[in-house]
Amino acid sequence: MIQTESMLDVADNSGARRVQCIKVLGGSHRRYASVGDIIKVTVKEAIPRGRVKKGDVMNAVVVRTKFGIRRPDGSVIRFDDNAAVLLNNNKAPIATRIFGPVTRELRTEQFMKIISLAPEVL
C-alpha cells in the first residue's frame, strides 16, 4: 500500500535511485496504490549521468510492495521493498532494463514491456 509521501526504490536503469509518491492517480480521493497502479512521483535521489535528475516529476507504476498482494487462490506475495518503474507521458517505461522480480498482475496490455524486460515474473 503506497500513499502520498511514501518513499520507493526505483527498479530500473533510468538513473533515479529513490522516488517519493506525491499523488495516487485514479480518482480524486484515492488513498492507496498497490502493484500495477500508476502514481505521480518526484525524484529524490539520482545518479550523476542518468536520464532523470533530482526534482523531476513523472509517472511511475508500482511493481513491488511490502504489503503484498493477494491472489485468487488465497496465496499472498510480499516483497522486501517498495519499488516502482518510471514511465514517460505515453505510459511506457523510460528505462531499458528492469531490476528484481515483478508480479503477474502487471500482465495487462499496458505493461507488457515491463514484463518482457523483467528478469523474473512471479
Swiss-Prot record:
Keywords: Ribonucleoprotein, Ribosomal protein, RNA-binding, rRNA-binding. This is Large ribosomal subunit protein uL14. HAMAP family: Ribosomal_uL14. The keyword Ribonucleoprotein applies. It comes from Acinetobacter baylyi (strain ATCC 33305 / BD413 / ADP1). Coiled coil: none annotated. GO terms for cellular component: cytosolic large ribosomal subunit. The gene is rplN. Gene3D superfamilies: Ribosomal protein L14. GO terms for molecular function: large ribosomal subunit rRNA binding; structural constituent of ribosome. Part of the 50S ribosomal subunit. Forms a cluster with proteins L3 and L19. In the 70S ribosome, L14 and L19 interact and together make contacts with the 16S rRNA in bridges B5 and B8. It comes from the Bacteria. It holds the Pfam family Ribosomal_L14. Signal peptide: none annotated. CDD domains: Ribosomal_uL14. Binds to 23S rRNA. Forms part of two intersubunit bridges in the 70S ribosome. Belongs to the universal ribosomal protein uL14 family. PROSITE patterns: RIBOSOMAL_L14. GO terms for biological process: translation.
